[in-house]
């Protein structure tokens, strides 16, 4: 069955009511309990029932082991162990699945038990969705859900959503979330015109909807034109009522349904402000292109630092090293963005402020954080160390060739590239590359066009390193240059609007690089700007709420923690009438 073959009569327009499936699927059993259950069930069947059962399936009938069916299917477990008259029958009819497909559903959990990842196509996953949900086979159903969600496109997402409403609420929720994320593409390709009225109203009232404010009214107007008055009457009323609402803070120039939360954001932690370490945590709203102070009401000791390292790894915000005005830190703090809990991690082998840091994945996909150089309060460092957050362990790696503090670091092709910096006497013009497989540093093949310390670097397409700003010993720099690892040469790129050192930079998407804060040679600055890699032009952005240097920025994309940072309420007043 192709998903395009689903007729409208087969599709639900709202989530199904809670059923026995929903109640049973919410009860998780440990593997140990299920393994223990198997011999008990086998013994029970041997004493009271035939060990096999004949199933009359879609295309033929076949004999199966009762214990095997019950072990992987809640449906068969209840059927064979209940006191119903049919429980002891040797024959059962299940017309919605063929024998090969039932064998495939039974093979999926067996493959996982052997450490093998199954491989089925999107088409087969769609075909197996209904029978796996009907038979309440939780492991195959979870896997099928993952396969479908990994293959969603703007062309199939609406039909798959409607199919999911019929059979599996968990899948429907995930596909809905994907529609919210992909809606700008649905708009650009006009696929959204096939949405039903209640579906489009539901999307427009979702605060997470990924749609530019300038396009919001066009979506409604074009959808109404595309559909008959009978189909669009409620949509016209909905638009008339809600587009006349007062201007929203995230889109003052356009008529919009409601305030929306951006899918992507830049979060600024720490830094050095006029009165010491910056206390405010700021977030950049990519919808409104402005900074705003956010509430971060978690009492986490020493998470606010300057000249520190910071990474987001597997939903953990990891802060290490740095300076608070009186001491250099050796400590590590981990904050779980999902559970909102924090804990202290292992100490580094050295105190490190002015530290450069980056992350890579080892050959097993395990994330590793590297802290390179810095200052321990007495001298600049050439040492480097690696943090395995899963094991909560810092391990020393090979030393760099030169002492470096306030350098720039970036990950390219799973190697650590450290550039520029200060050794206590000289500002560096060259860089080094660390190969984690060989545990060796080797120099870059050429030097930058100018010496730089207090600079920042970003990776472009995992092949090109872009280094920005800094201090050359005489003045703050507005220049930037790129180094292509394949070519081994440096090339100039357009200059910043504001010369700065000790600032932060990050790449939001494949086309935009953001910089903020720093020291401009006269004072700490609150200015920020963005480079559009397509036009190769810098654009000035609104200022941060306070001037700060030595700050660190991270990006969060489609993350639940953004709900807390932006704190945009669910505007239930919009939909109560509908």
Swiss-Prot record:
Parts forming coiled coils: none
Keyword Repeat annotated: yes
Domain spans labelled BACK: 158-236
Domain of life of the source: Eukaryota
Keywords in alphabetical order: Kelch repeat, Repeat
Listed GO MF terms: ubiquitin-like ligase-substrate adaptor activity
GO biological process, one term: proteasome-mediated ubiquitin-dependent protein catabolic process
Pfam family, one: Kelch_KLHDC2_KLHL20_DRC7
Protein name as catalogued: Kelch repeat-containing protein kel-10
Organism listed in the record: Caenorhabditis elegans
Gene: kel-10
